[in-house]
Amino acid sequence: MKEKVVLAYSGGLDTSIIIPWLKENYDLDVIAVCVNVGQGDDMDYVKTKAIKSGASKIYVEDVKEEFVVDYLYKAIKSEALYEQDYMLGTSFARPLMAKKLVEIAHKEQAKYICHGCTGKGNDQVRFEVGVKAQDPTIKIIAPWRIWDIKSREDAIDYAKKVGVEVPVTKKKIYSVDRNLWHVSHEGGDLEDLKNEHKEDMYFMVTPPEKAKDEPTYLEIYFEKGVPVKINGEFLNPVDIIDKLNTIGGENGIGIADIIENRLVGMKSRGIYETPAGTLLYAAHKKLESVTLDKYTYQYKKLVSAQYGELVYNGLWFTALREAIDAFVDKTQENVTGTVKLKLYKGNIKPCSVDTEYALYDEGISSFGESELYSHKDAEGFINLFGLPCKIKALKNF
């Protein structure tokens, strides 16, 4: 009986040609696993294609709700970003995929897990660290670090040679990653920074200048930092993301053209569509500004950046990630209320906040006197606060 390898399978270019390559070079029984995180593919087609390409079996794991509840909710509550721009759509999906790969490897008693990540990318780290953190005895096969194929053009040629159909041509060469949270586009003419990215690549977002001419008003209700209602309607977690993707997309919301510093050392360029995430972060930030005290609000921004880098670097299965989540959950205890946004041609304008947990007090914040604050109090505060500056000036050195 042949030994088994579990392949992270998408039906795209890389994983499509890996099946015959594994059989040719390793003589392994290939078990394909497609983890459905909302990439929008025809799963019946993916199943058929995997078997036609030579897999002995394929699992399709629908984990969209788990993706939202156990991963994207953490993104929203923490407002995690990498380098202030990237909303981590790929990064949050990879640990869940790694988890499912290990589960099926155990079920099938497979000794190997294989992925189609390139040797220059971050995903190879995310997958492999995720696997090692769960089962360090499983061996990894990473074809892009081994085989003679050096480019996507070479991969297309190999696919033709072995008779594998692929949804990419040399004329349309972008590498695309899609899930409920985002769509990313990399490669091709994007690698030349002098090239403006082409708007016809978008999957979810209407170009802002072509978006509708009337503004859209949107209300999002959060409960302990998690979105539960859209425009007054309770929706399940997956439907909330889908609905906000539609609303944001038709208003030109959520396009980012980013140069990022990869974990493996080089810079890369990606075009990202994240309409739901962009809306949720904007609304959540506004609600936090009203419900969190000054010191928690400011410190959480530092933690959010650390969390974003940790997730980007593939360190999901760590004590630090769990500890940060515990801190974030504590901060979200009173992040409950409704935020109203105005959307227009790529722009988001927060209009109002309605929450019973507001730390903003109109009576104190107005220009008049109040029981808690007297204008006269300011003089003593300023004298103490500015004392170091005054001493420095008096010393005159």
From Swiss-Prot:
Q: Which residues bind L-aspartate?
A: 118, 122-123
Q: How does it assemble?
A: Homotetramer.
Q: Which Pfam families match?
A: Arginosuc_syn_C, Arginosuc_synth
Protein name in the entry: Argininosuccinate synthase
Provide the binding site for L-citrulline: 86, 91, 122, 126, 175, 184, 260, 272
Q: What is its EC number?
A: 6.3.4.5
Task: Write down the InterPro entries for this protein, in alphabetical order.
Answer: Arginosuc_syn_C, Arginosuc_syn_N, Arginosuc_synth, Arginosuc_synth_CS, Arginosuc_synth_type_1_subfam, AS_cat/multimer_dom_body, Rossmann-like_a/b/a_fold
Q: What is its main location?
A: cytoplasm
UniProt: ATP binding residues:
8-16, 116
Query: Mind listing the UniProt keywords for this protein, alphabetically?
Result: Amino-acid biosynthesis, Arginine biosynthesis, ATP-binding, Cytoplasm, Ligase, Nucleotide-binding
Tell me which stretches of the chain form a coiled coil. none
User: A Gene Ontology CC term for this entry?
Assistant: cytoplasm
Could you tell me which pathway this protein works in? Answer: Amino-acid biosynthesis; L-arginine biosynthesis; L-arginine from L-ornithine and carbamoyl phosphate: step 2/3
NCBIfam families from the UniProt entry: argG, PRK00509.1
Spell out the reaction equation it catalyses.
L-citrulline + L-aspartate + ATP = 2-(N(omega)-L-arginino)succinate + AMP + diphosphate + H(+)
